[in-house]
Amino acid sequence: MDNALPEPEPLIALIEALRRLPGVGARSARRMAYHLLQHDVQGADMLGRALAGAVQNLRRCARCNSFTEDDVCVICANPKRDASLLCIVETPADQNVIESSHGYRGLYYVLMGRLAPLEGVGPRELDFQRVLDRAADGLVQEVILATNFTAEGETTAHFLGEALAERGLKVTRLARGVPAGSELEYVDAGTIAWALMERRAT
C-alpha cells in the first residue's frame, strides 16, 4: 500500500521536467523542485524565463550547427578565423572547452551528438551528409576530429575519418594526452591545447 503524500500536478510536472537533465534522477529532481519552491521562488521564476527565452530565441548556426541568435554565429562570421581548419566536436560544451584553451583559431562543426546505434542514433540522425558537405566547401584543408574519447566518440571519429579521407581531405585526431574514456567537457584547457598541438593523422 502506497502511503506517499499525493503531490499536486504542477509539482509532478516540474519534477518530471527536471528529470530530463543529464544525471538527474527522480530523487534529485524532487529535491531541486522543493528547494526552488520553498527557498528560491525568484530563482525558479528566473530559470523559467531564461529557459523560455533560450528556446524561443536560439537557433542553429547555418555554418557550424552550434547555437546562435543569428543565422551565422560570431565564430563563423569572424573573418580572422582560419577557414582552412575545421574542428568537429560532439556538443557546444566541447566547442567551448576547445575555444577556452586558446590553442585553436579555425572553425567548427558541432554534431549535436555521437553515433550510438543501440540508442537509434546513426549517420542519418546526425546528418553526416551536411558535415561532409561543410568540409568539402573548397576552403577546408584539414579536419580535426575532436569527438570524445569514449567508445561512441571513437566510433564517430572513425566513421567520419574514413568518409572525409575518401574526399581527399587531411584528417587528424586529438593527441592521446586526453585520457581514454573521457569527455572533453571535463578536460582542463591546458591538456586540450596540448592535444590540439600534438594532433595526429588518422
UniProtKB/Swiss-Prot annotation:
ZnF segments: C4-type: 61-76
Q: For this chain's UniProt record, which GO biological process terms are given?
A: DNA recombination; DNA repair
Q: Does the keyword Glycoprotein apply?
A: no
| Matching InterPro entries | DNA_Rcmb_RecR (IPR000093), Rcmb_RecR (IPR023627), Rcmb_RecR_Znf (IPR015967), TOPRIM_dom (IPR006171), TOPRIM_RecR (IPR034137)
Question: What start-end ranges are recorded for coiled-coil regions in this protein?
Answer: none
The family database entries (SUPFAM superfamilies) matched by this protein are listed as: Recombination protein RecR
Cleaved signal peptide residues: none
This entry's Gene Ontology molecular function terms read:
DNA binding; zinc ion binding
Which Pfam family would be a valid example here?
RecR_C
Tell me the ranges covered by the Toprim domain, including all copies: 84-179
Gene3D superfamilies given for it?
3.40.1360.10, RecR Domain 1
Q: Which UniProt keywords apply?
A: DNA damage, DNA recombination, DNA repair, Metal-binding, Zinc, Zinc-finger
Q: Which domain of life is it from?
A: Bacteria
Give the record's family classification. Belongs to the RecR family.
What role does it play?
May play a role in DNA repair. It seems to be involved in an RecBC-independent recombinational process of DNA repair. It may act with RecF and RecO.
Q: What name is this protein filed under?
A: Recombination protein RecR
